[in-house]
């Protein structure tokens, strides 16, 4: 095993300047074996989570690879996310690997929510297709992105709109009232105890999609109403986004996951808490990232443009990524050379001990088989 060198990387964005305090909009940490310049390196980016110190970075660096944990300006800044802007800033990181770090082959690592984001990056690089959101200006920088040479999806979600819709509580009757509830759809109420029957599941899923569509209709109407005023956009809240029936009922898509559990613990408590995905958005961010109708953050169409060798690694005890998600990712990939592997662990590969090392071996060996 190698000792590891960690190098902070701060770079300009093609879209915005440095912060007044001096910070670069694009930032990350490059991990590599000490005294060695790898010719193959990974890059991992998420929609809003800080991946600069990604948990796999030291493991893959120990195995001889470079690893750039890369953040766009939307790290910790989810309410303002725009896909085309994020792709341009991922491109800054990929270009740095090739032009400065001396990397010849880039592996795009799409982990967790980053699965659909990195798929969108590769898709745009090989066949430009991403459009500005709701009247935004075209981003020239995404027309000539450097494509990745391999693609890895690790414990990856199927896309932001699907994840939010599958997790959102459709019993909300008033988007301005976090306590409003339709008791006939309340997954935690006495009328609907788990295990849930097929009819309730059908009604529930339909109501989730209907809630997403209602918010999209409202967002489009508000943008239209703001046209010609002093405001170009506005922020709004979204309540109760920890209510996927699979979090509560382990009989739906059985797996190794802990029953009645989500990433924040007890789903009933998390659902009425302050933390969750999509809890605050601008109108344009909703349309760019969360809307089933308008978002381009859905993985499937992007995966259909990915033809480089691809690996999907699924954690079978993941609380909120299910077997059907991994199967769909694998199915939609257009790569002739693709593989689906599983590890018996949670979303972050924390338990049992040694799982991260096992996953790193799996990924490193797969890459080694496909690179000189």
What are these regions (language model features)?
Residues 32-65, 69-76:
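Short, surface-exposed "cap/lid" segments of acyl-processing enzymes
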Residues 96-99, 105-176:
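Primarily recognizes the serine-hydrolase "nucleophile elbow" in alpha/beta-hydrolase
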Residues 48, 73-107, 357:
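Catalytic nucleophile-loop/oxyanion-hole region of alpha/beta-hydrolase
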Residues 1-40, 352-353:
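N-terminal cap/lid segment of alpha/beta-hydrolase-fold proteins
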Residues 345-357:
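Catalytic histidine-centered segment of alpha/beta-hydrolase-like enzymes
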Residues 140-263:
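Alpha/beta-hydrolase-fold enzymes
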Residues 162-163, 319-325:
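Conserved alpha/beta-hydrolase "acid-adjacent" motif
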Residues 306, 312-314, 318:
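Short beta-strand/loop motif that positions the catalytic acidic residue
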